[in-house]
A protein has these predicted regions:
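Structural marker of alpha-solenoid helical repeat scaffolds
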Residues: 444-445, 479, 508, 535, ...
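Helix-start (N-cap) detector for alpha-helical repeat units in TPR-like alpha-solenoids
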Residues: 449-451, 484-485, 513-514, 540-541, ...
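Position-specific recognition of the canonical hydrophobic site in helix A of tetratricopeptide repeat
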Residues: 461, 495, 524, 551, ...
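Primarily the internal scaffold of c-type cytochrome electron-transfer domains
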Residues: 24, 28, 35, 43-119, ...
């Protein structure tokens, strides 16, 4: 099955032509270059530039380099059997990745330029490459300050299948940088995260103080947002716009309203007007400690809950000036002692020096084990083994209700009720339970945003109801006739019209690589797939798709360069090379696929390749492994039946053929082979029954052989 890239319509023209038609926050919402702030606020700007927020995003340069490129340039990642090298050439920074293939040769070599660094280095530094299309891709290797500074895999990549095409979404830059420019039209849901022109470097003043263009133009006479003068909720919203993430897991933890652009939130506005935050159901994953969970943990603390809105982020944190070391401990502990000096039980000695080490300890993040953060839960006793090292694990899918978390309570409005239903369905967490409410509310409200109908269509598809999915996607297209993403979705659930639908998609969105790719795969057209690659060569599935259609070794090599951890690409390589008689290389590829994911289908394909090389005993070993891995793989049972029959092991052969038929009763060729085996065993009646089934099948050649065998079985 072909998997299509997750991103929506790409405005895949060159970066420079996009600059003439951009949407920037400056032109829409009155933002300006924050360097102007330092003219009047020199001291504050200088202190802020040293904070983590001020150093959150930047181009790599000698002045901000903390890594030791000369001493430790290489890193080997054993889990994925891949090598990395970080290098500097002529003042430019690069990350190179490779593996070792047959005869010790380097394979799957990819080197990309590091255009930006995301992360101040307080917790980590992560490297971004900017594509010609203006997208940002996070490369797999990162740097962490632990143990004096060391290389390590980025979160989500310290696994057997690191992420080689981790695109940076708009929501990532929303919090890790100042306001960037994006192409006109990309404010809509599902738009690809394309950026235009030079990106700002670091979170700027306007993230908390709002648009500053008019303030600068009038030399300070026009007011800006002063968070300290907002209400308690308003002040918290300013912080929580970025620091609140109930979980990094696979739920809609921050559901942005569909009519809002990705950078449209203005400090001072109610955050709920921009997004609603969701959490797991009560009692599910309660004790997690995640990297971006500081505000989430803080809001669970007794100190916060019982303070009567007297405790907030600003009690401890001055965003303009972050203390370090002993000064930080003294400052934060002083805040604690405003309440707790007299509140401690009698006989408990309270030191003004340090409340933090015990009650807000450093902990490793569950979702980013290389990173260490402060625990804001403010617990009486520090959790055990808070800094113990552990291996990263792939997140487990969550199935169940997702519940509104912030604001609490969520205001009871029809629109908010609709978003609550969207949250159940949109990422597939609670589809069966959520769909009735989503359907009811949409019938009542008849929303005018196409995205609601995209969610509805996805829900019906998830439930196996293509008819209703078609109706939903068609309504999305009535509301937004040029929505190529809806056309692609419609083509998947209406295969009889898929070709004409996708032809329309590439007509209305000729620069959308995903439509060209889906169209090319449907029609087995190398030309259309190559068109998709030309529009955006960074979508990995396109190269594998081209190799599937053309059986080209060059396309296969490109697929594995783009993602050498794609087991499907390795398996495809094994099949292509087997066809060409290159068995040694083919078996290497099969073994790689199985090492990454030992699925029954990969083991079965390896067994077929071994048969082509006349290695029947080895083929039987792999076929048996395939059945152990996937007992429902009928083709593996069929193959085992043939291998047993070849050795004259008729009882075992019959058993495997029967297992295959039990799984797929209409396999005419298996009925034929089973009939032959049974006839050889002298079980004439049973043989005849299976031969008649084979004769009734749609395969003319099989039917002819079955009829011939039946004639031979007939009494003379």
């Amino acid at each position: 099955m072909v998997r299509f890239p997750i991103f929506a319509t790409l405005l895949a023209v060159s970066l420079w032509s996009l600059s003439a038609q951009t949407t920037g926050t400056a032109s829409i919402n009155g933002f300006t270059d924050s360097k102007a702030c330092a003219t009047c606020h020199r001291d504050i700007a200088a202190k802020y530039a040293r904070t983590g927020m001020g150093r959150s995003f930047y181009k790599p340069a000698a002045a901000n380099t903390v890594e030791d490129y000369a001493k430790t340039p290489e890193y080997y990642h054993a889990l994925s059997d891949s090598h990395y090298r970080m290098t500097i050439r002529n003042g430019e920074y690069f990350q190179r990745r490779w593996q070792i293939g047959l005869d010790g040769k380097e394979i799957n070599v990819e080197e990309v330029k590091i255009d930006y660094v995301i992360g101040s280095g307080n917790h980590g530094r992560f490297y971004l490459h900017r594509t010609e299309q203006g997208m940002l891709v996070e490369v797999p290797l990162a740097w962490y300050p632990v143990k004096g500074g060391q290389w390590g895999m980025a979160p989500g990549s310290d696994l057997p299948q690191p992420k080689t095409r981790q695109f940076i979404a708009y929501k990532c830059l929303f919090c890790h940088d100042a306001y960037p420019k994006i192409p006109a039209g990309n404010e809509v849901p599902g738009a690809d995260p394309v950026f235009v022109g030079d990106l700002p470097e670091g979170i700027d003043c306007q993230r908390c103080h709002g648009p500053g263009a008019e303030h600068v133009r009038t030399y300070g006479k026009a007011a800006m947002v002063n968070p300290s003068k907002l209400s308690f909720d308003g002040r918290m919203d300013v912080c929580l716009q970025c620091h609140l993430e109930p979980t990094g897991g696979d739920i809609p933890t921050k559901l942005q309203r569909f009519e809002r652009g990705p950078f449209s939130y203005i400090p001072g506005q109610p955050l709920v007007d921009f997004a609603i935050f969701f959490d797991y159901a009560p009692g599910r994953r309660e004790n997690r400690f995640e990297g971006v969970g500081g505000a989430f943990q803080f809001r669970k603390s007794r100190c916060y809950l019982e303070s009567g809105q007297k405790l907030e982020c600003g009690n401890c944190h001055d965003p303009h000036d972050v203390p370090r070391g002993p000064a930080a401990i003294r400052q934060y502990s002083a805040v604690c002692l405003k309440c707790h000096r007299t509140a401690h039980p009698a006989g408990v000695r309270v030191s003004s020096a340090d409340c933090i080490t015990c009650h807000m300890p450093k902990r490793r993040a569950d979702d980013a084990p290389h990173m260490i953060f402060t625990d804001h839960r403010i617990q009486r006793r520090a959790p055990a083994n808070a800094l113990s090292e552990f291996a990263e694990s792939a997140p487990e899918p969550y199935h169940g209700e997702v519940v509104p978390y912030y604001p609490a309570p969520l205001p009871a409005t029809p629109e908010n009720d609709l978003y609550r239903a969207v949250a159940q369905v949109g990422t597939g967490n609670n589809v069966a339970a959520g769909m009735p409410e989503l359907v009811r509310l949409m019938e009542e409200m008849k929303p005018s945003e196409a995205e609601y109908y995209m969610v509805l269509g996805g829900g019906w598809k998830n439930l196996g109801n293509p008819t209703e999915a078609v109706a939903a996607y068609e309504q999305a297209l009535r509301l937004k006739p040029d929505l190529a993403r809806a056309m692609r979705a419609l083509a998947e659930v209406q295969p009889e019209r898929a070709e004409s639908i996708l032809a329309r998609a590439v007509e209305v969105a000729p620069n959308d690589p995903e439509s060209w790719f889906q169209f090319g795969m449907l029609t087995a057209s190398a030309e259309r797939i190559q068109k998709a690659i030309a529009l955006n060569p960074w979508f990995r599935d396109q190269y594998r798709g081209l190799a599937e259609v053309t059986h080209s070794e060059e396309a296969l090599k490109a697929a594995l360069r783009s993602d050498p951890f794609d087991d499907a690409a390795w398996d495809l390589g094994g099949r292509i090379l087997t066809e060409k008689g290159k068995f040694r290389e083919a078996f290497f590829d099969f073994q790689r696929a199985i090492a990454i994911r030992p699925s029954g289908s990969h083991l079965f394909d390896y067994a077929l390749g071994l048969i082509r090389a006349d290695r029947f005993d080895d083929a039987q070993i792999q076929a048996e492994a395939a059945v152990r891995e996937d007992v429902n793989l009928a083709e593996a049972h069929e193959l085992l039946g043939g291998l047993h029959a070849r050795k004259g092991e008729l009882t075992q052969a019959a058993g495997e053929y029967m297992a295959a038929i039990a799984l797929k009763p209409d396999l005419a060729r298996v009925h034929l082979r089973l009939g032959m085996v049974l006839a050889t065993q002298g079980k004439t009646d049973e043989a005849a029954a299976h031969l008649r089934e084979a004769a009734r099948g749609n395969d003319a050649a099989v039917a002819e052989q079955a009829n011939q065998a039946l004639r031979q079985l007939a009494p003379r």
